[in-house]
């Protein structure tokens, strides 16, 4: 059985978030009101609520890089990850860390991007 998650986070601009998650990322919108919207987030449920997002700081030490904390991510098959990266790049997404491979040639090698 595959375990699924539900994550609810704040976004400042719900219309902009609908465009990004629905249009750019290709997620299907589900239930919604004027203050929140649910998305099928690659098989998981992402619930975006209008409000002030968590503050982030670059305090996570990963492979000699300081990454934003807190953060969340997806583990995708590489072809699906690459297609998503291309969609995000084509849309002019402002990346914190552009798509790249981390831990190259090592156990746990991973493709990553932060935006």
Language model features: what each stretch is:
Residues 55, 60-75, 79:
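Helix-adjacent hinge/juxtasegments
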Residues 5, 25, 33-35, 70, ...:
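Residue-level marker for the onset of beta-strands and adjacent loop->beta junctions
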Residues 85-115:
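Vicinal oxygen chelate
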Residues 1-15, 71-72, 76:
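N-terminal beta-strand motif that seeds the catalytic metal site of vicinal oxygen chelate
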Residues 29, 37-38, 61-64, 104-105:
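Short secondary-structure boundary/capping segments
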Residues 10-53:
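Core segments of cupin and vicinal oxygen chelate
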Residues 1-3, 65-69, 106-107:
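Short glycine-enriched loop/turn motifs at secondary-structure junctions
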Residues 16-17, 79-84:
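Short, conserved charged micro-motifs
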């Amino acid at each position: 059985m595959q375990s699924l998650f539900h994550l609810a986070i704040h976004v400042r601009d719900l219309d902009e978030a609908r465009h990004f998650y629905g249009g750019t990322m290709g997620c299907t919108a589900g239930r919604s009101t004027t203050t929140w919207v649910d998305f099928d987030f690659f098989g998981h449920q992402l619930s975006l609520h209008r409000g002030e997002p968590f503050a982030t700081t670059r305090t996570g030490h990963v492979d000699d890089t300081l990454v934003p904390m807190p953060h969340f991510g997806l583990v995708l098959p590489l072809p699906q990850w690459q297609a998503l990266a291309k969609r995000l790049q084509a849309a002019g997404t402002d990346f914190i860390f552009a798509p790249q491979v981390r831990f190259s040639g090592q156990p746990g090698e991973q493709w990553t991007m932060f935006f």
